[in-house]
């Protein structure tokens, strides 16, 4: 059934819903201030170099934000979901497997002085071996817009290029303000954000990354009123009964991959079930598939662009 969530989907949601929250606990003045103590998203206190020289990043967001803050990488996850300039910059950087399946042996052999990872089970499993090898690893989560800015600022401190990080932040905030200003004086639309795989569909809450952006733009996320049974990682199972009652004015659809099969399945659902046909969004042709590069994974430095895309879709009454 369409409203079932599998264990595999939950892991994917953890990957999408989010990747990197930095929380600084304190700093140690040790060895001429070469070490700092931070608390990662898993609540672990980790002693890391103040300015690491050999960094391995295990997800797209870490790669994007660290490089954009002036850093260079010794190793990285194999991923194509990067901004063009970052993708070019890391083209020759050795890969250490995929985000959900990092090659631990390769990572240890590189002898990095810092590993940037996501707060997900796949990366939690790396901790014992890396700690034993004396390699610090930060498990990070990013669930909203503000956490992107915080992480950029943190990475600027690590790379010693705080000005470059500040410039990136200023650019993002400018795009953010433009997107928000475009909503001024316009009625707040009722919005449904869907996350889809070939197996099932879920509704995104405001605690999800895309849900946070919708809320910042003044959209009313109807999913926040849904039954929270089965909720995990900012998503709840899709309920067609709920959709029929909520009658969203805009439906935004995110696929977990660039595979057209998910989109085809969703279109078939829209055409074949009265719950969809009765919604304002479907009747007014305001159902939009969100760009994979900006919404299927955390957009990192492209979050300002993601805001601009959302603003246009939420507040345009034109049929798409």
Residue positions per predicted region:
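Structured C-terminal subdomain patch of bacterial secreted/periplasmic proteins
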Residues: 157, 166, 253-320
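Short secondary-structure boundary segments
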Residues: 59, 119-120, 250, 254-258
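Proline-aspartate-enriched helix->loop->beta-strand connector
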Residues: 96, 104-117, 135, 239-253
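Bacterial Sec-exported substrate-binding components of ABC uptake systems
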Residues: 2-61, 162-194, 255, 309-320
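Extracytoplasmic ligand-binding site segments that recognize negatively charged/polar headgroups
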Residues: 122-126, 138-154, 188-213, 259-261
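Short helix-initiation/N-cap motifs at beta->coil->alpha
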Residues: 41-43, 94-105, 228-240
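His/Asp/Glu-enriched short active-site or ligand-binding loop at hydrolase and phosphoryl-transfer sites
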Residues: 84, 211-232
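A short, structured surface patch at a secondary-structure boundary
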Residues: 59-110, 114-119, 222
């Amino acid at each position: 059934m369409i409203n079932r969530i599998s264990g595999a989907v939950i892991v994917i949601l953890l990957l999408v819903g989010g990747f990197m929250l930095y929380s600084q606990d304190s700093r140690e003045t040790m060895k001429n201030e070469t070490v700092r103590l931070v608390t990662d998203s898993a609540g672990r206190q980790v002693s890391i170099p103040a300015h690491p020289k050999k960094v391995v990043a295990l997800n797209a967001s870490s790669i994007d934000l660290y490089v954009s803050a002036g850093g260079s990488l010794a190793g990285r996850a194999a991923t194509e979901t990067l901004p063009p300039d970052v993708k070019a910059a890391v083209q020759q950087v050795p890969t250490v497997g995929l985000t959900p399946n990092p090659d631990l042996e390769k990572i240890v052999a590189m002898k990095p002085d810092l590993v940037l990872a996501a707060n997900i089970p796949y990366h939690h499993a790396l901790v014992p071996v890396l700690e034993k090898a004396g390699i610090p690893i930060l498990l990070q989560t990013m669930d909203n817009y503000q956490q992107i800015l915080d992480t950029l600022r943190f990475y600027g401190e690590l790379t010693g290029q705080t000005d470059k990080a500040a410039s990136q932040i200023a650019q993002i905030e400018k795009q953010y303000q433009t997107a928000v200003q475009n909503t001024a004086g316009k009625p707040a639309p009722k919005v449904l954000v869907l996350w889809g795989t070939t197996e099932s569909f879920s509704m995104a809450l405001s605690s999800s990354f895309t849900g946070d952006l919708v809320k910042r733009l003044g959209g009313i996320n109807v999913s926040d009123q849904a039954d929270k049974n089965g909720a995990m990682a900012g998503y709840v199972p899709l309920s067609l009964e709920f959709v029929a009652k909520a009658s969203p004015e805009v439906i935004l659809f995110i696929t977990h991959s660039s595979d057209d099969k998910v989109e085809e399945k969703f279109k078939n659902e829209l055409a074949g079930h009265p719950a969809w046909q009765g919604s304002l969004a479907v009747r007014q042709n305001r159902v939009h598939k969100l760009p994979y590069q900006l919404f299927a994974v955390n957009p990192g430095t492209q979050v300002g662009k993601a805001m601009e895309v959302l603003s246009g879709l939420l507040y345009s009454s034109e049929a798409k």
